[in-house]
């Protein structure tokens, strides 16, 4: 199985300025992400950034980075530019690992790539784990996904789906026993042909209402398959508290 890992790393961040360059045990966060990705089965790991400072930081630690335009509306648009710059063929597979995931498990990267390889009818693969509890089911910041028997995604939503009618009658807020409710994990594998088409896809109503980019692909008829894992991976770094947690994790490993 051959695939490339691309790590989009945008320097601007409202909650954590210069996030890709934040120090984690002596190295920039984006370098820590690249190190984790390099432990997967990827043939190549490449950082895609909008700032020369990130590119230089990667080079200083022996990692490749490509400089992309600063005006991309989404990380997926940035990937589209990167695959063209790298000259990847349409049938190649790219795994998108976010630049704020310094605790990503290499095995999860491999599993998502393998899920796409096993589904030639699909353009995208992603990942999900069982919902932890009723609080997660009703939390709009926890994205839910429902799947067909063949692991094809039927819908992603911030709403509590599937809706257990009887268990939730009368306003109850419970996680019904046996409910096939999955917590979406934002790691993606793409076929390069899809990434090249993505910038031309118009944003649909579902994406606008839910604010979920993956719905754009589904609204345009593209198939997403979902790898199921038993437990949620470590969360990414979005806040100063998240950064301290990641630093502590690395300190404990050293």
From Swiss-Prot:
Its main location: cytoplasm. InterPro entries: Cytidylyl_trans, KdsB, Nucleotide-diphossugar_trans. Pfam families: CTP_transf_3 (PF02348). One of its GO terms (biological process) is CMP-keto-3-deoxy-D-manno-octulosonic acid biosynthetic process. Keywords: Cytoplasm, Lipopolysaccharide biosynthesis, Nucleotidyltransferase, Transferase. GO terms for molecular function: 3-deoxy-manno-octulosonate cytidylyltransferase activity. It is an enzyme of class 2 (transferase). It catalyses: 3-deoxy-alpha-D-manno-oct-2-ulosonate + CTP = CMP-3-deoxy-beta-D-manno-octulosonate + diphosphate. Its EC number is 2.7.7.38. The keyword Cytoplasm applies. It is found in: Cytoplasm. Belongs to the KdsB family. This is 3-deoxy-manno-octulosonate cytidylyltransferase. It comes from Bordetella parapertussis (strain 12822 / ATCC BAA-587 / NCTC 13253).
